[in-house]
Amino acid sequence: MVDCDWSNLPEELLHMIVLLLFSVVELKRFRSICRSWRSSTSGVNRNNPFPSRPRIHFDPIDPSETLSSDDSYISRPGAFLSRAAFFRVTLSSSSSKGWMIKSDMDINSGRFRLLNVLSRYPLRLYSESIDLLEFTVSEIREAYTVLNTAKRRSATKGYQRSAPVKVKEGEGHRDGVLGIGRDGNINYWDGNVLSELKQMGDHFSDIIVHKGLINSDLEISRFGTSLDENITDGCWGDLRFVEGCGELYIVERLPKNTRKRKAGDFFHNSRTVGFKAYKMDEELAKWIEIKTLGDNAFLMGTDTCFSVLAHEVYGCLPNSIYYTENTWPKVCKLEDGNGSSIIVTMSESSKSSFEMFYPSFV
């Protein structure tokens, strides 16, 4: 075997490697290898492919230009669009399995902090640093929510679910935010004025930008079709979008107390008894129920949902859905094909099923 001095790689090659990195954490790990690698990224403006994202503040605006006087909560000073990132962490010596962590940045101190993966609540105790030579940290997803203040970790009433968008302005673009309020209406902040998209109606509970297209249930703009009410007989639970392997799914949380879905009835707290999952059949142009998720597990966070491969994450149950209820983490194990499910709340006896959320270094 021929030894290679990795510290003497050509600077041009190092620049090419930097351009292939996809997150700030990857860049920091690259810089930690040795002095020559670190110096190759010293020119921030020229070489740093991850400039800081602009923070979107919902500045106080004239009440006459907001939704209505009753919705003045959204124009409180300090409201802002908060970004969180999800990471897969593996041992550098063995990358076959890993853990999931989530972090955001404290806007007061500028420091990163770890959050509960399924919510926005900070972890109380965790290590102040991670050895990037011992662990490989890869950013896999980001999520956004509108917070009233830096201290408050729950979303504002008008933006229970949020999606940042680019607004065309002349030859350029500026940042805007679409969100769904507790009343099921879609609200829009264009950087200056808050408005309600009344023409869209009031039957929405989630929103997502998927492959560059904005989708919001129950109407899906990409396909121009709604979820077939014949499947659920019009008794809707909490509907969420889930992205997995490039596909878009809808997951319906089934409450114990079923009732006809109506405006203002989207974020109720009835106990969950199961889930149903749907996938778009592009040939039939309709949503169809799927009976099994295979090796996939869906993570239903308060700010975004996505899928992971169970065999790549410690303790993760395949064909299952992880979620929170009254701040408690739970997992719903779907039974293949028969429509039933088993719900487990995290406890000492079931802790291994939630191992992916509690890395050894935390």
Curated annotation (Swiss-Prot):
InterPro entries: F-box-like_dom_sf, KIB1-4_b-propeller, SCF_F-box_domain
Name of the protein this chain belongs to: Uncharacterized protein At1g65760
Protein's organism: Arabidopsis thaliana
